[in-house]
Amino acid sequence: MPIQQLPMMKGMGKDFKNADYIDYLPVNMLATPKEILNSSGYLRSFPGITKRYDMNGVSRGVEYNTAQNAVYRVCGGKLYKGESEVGDVAGSGRVSMAHGRTSQAVGVNGQLVEYRYDGTVKTVSNWPADSGFTQYELGSVRDITRLRGRYAWSKDGTDSWFITDLEDESHPDRYSAQYRAESQPDGIIGIGTWRDFIVCFGSSTIEYFSLTGATTAGAALYVAQPSLMVQKGIAGTYCKTPFADSYAFISHPATGAPSVYIIGSGQASPIATASIEKIIRSYTAEEMATGVMETLRFDSHELLIIHLPRHVLVYDASSSQNGPQWCVLKTGLYDDVYRGVDFMYEGNQITCGDKSEAVVGQLQFDISSQYDKQQEHLLFTPLFKADNARCFDLEVESSTGVAQYADRLFLSATTDGINYGREQMIEQNEPFVYDKRVLWKRVGRIRRLIGFKLRVITKSPVTLSGCQIRLE
């Protein structure tokens, strides 16, 4: 009697609206490529979250400050260095952050505010009119970054960006502060640094600027590098993040249907699958512009996390050798958006802000709950043909024994890729029982097709691999 191995890294089914084949992505489960028990990998629950300390409000931005060797967070109306308050931050929306030797900068409400380490707060403004230095139309700050002793910021609604003075960071450069990304007439959406370049992200192009090395007063300090220009734009100010020694970003509708790309050697390489692009396509341009991208690394996972208004998507570079590996994160037992955001390695813990409550949490690897609430984990197998076959012994390898009480796994089957039937409950975890089998002995007769869904609701970590079924 043949034994059929069933992959669980990505399920396959149909969309009931248009009958197209779609991927069923793992929910709250990460794929780990590692040879174990006749499998090429296993799936592990995303780490749980426990409360670390209270904050003033929800998370608005985070940066690791290398000058102070501390994590700076903007939560609610406050800027925090670790747990201690540093100053007040206006507004309630997302903020841009950068830091230097003498100050931590926050771009908020159209201003670049510098919180100096000596306790003073300065806002970038023009030199005094009687100084004799050029007076610039600074406008409103959209995004900020820092490179080689200077802050750089983009002017909202224009293709101009500015740099601060070397001696006094609270003023523009006294001789040549203003530069233009002339391929972006609609304005610079975001700005960043890569190696020794200033990177300006527009809606249809990404431009790079390098230092000229000029020392003459009034000479241009930066010049565009057309050989590195990328013919794609970003969807929103925070729809970009450094990733894999380059930048990952969500593209703007101006260059076609949006997707997720990684920049490499002046080219943008797509990493999104068709199912991911369908999720992204379900958002309007205005909704997409509110997206936030960030990176997270632990246990050899190189994660790119995309926070959208109704989804949190995760791309794992370490598991994508045989094709892009994506999963979905969520909170609760329904389809609530994942609450964690702004992950940062702090001390020997990974800390995170929160989208809904005024707390900072930390990831904990021996649980899968979020703030002591059970979470749902979903895995799917592909549809496969089993014409008029009888099925027995559906078995999943599970690493068990760490639960506080007996957990059950809910198994259900589909014969059309759309509707899943009644769930079969199987005990899959029990305290101190480290070799428990997860086995459904009699599945039944299959007319033509079958696929399975595995659902676990628990506070304990979940480790599953090696799904197989016996056919006759």
Swiss-Prot record:
InterPro entries in the cross-refs: Phage_P22_Gp10
Subunit structure: Monomer (in solution). Hexamer; assembles as a hexamer onto the dodecamer formed by the head-to-tail adapter gp4. Interacts with the head-to-tail adapter protein gp4; each gp10 monomer contacts 2 head-to-tail adapter protein gp4. Interacts with the tail needle protein gp26. Interacts with the tail spike protein gp9; binds six tail spike trimers.
UniProt main location, coarse: virion
UniProt entry tagged with the keyword Kinase: no
Organism: Salmonella phage P22 (Bacteriophage P22)
Gene behind the chain: 10
Disulphide bonds in the chain: none
Localization per Swiss-Prot or TrEMBL: Virion
Record protein name field: Tail hub protein gp10
Keyword Glycoprotein recorded: no
Protein function: Acts as a tail hub by assembling onto the head-to-tail adapter protein gp4, generating a channel that is sealed by the tail needle protein gp26. Together with gp4 and gp26, gp10 is required for stabilization of the condensed DNA within the capsid; perhaps by plugging the hole through which the DNA enters.
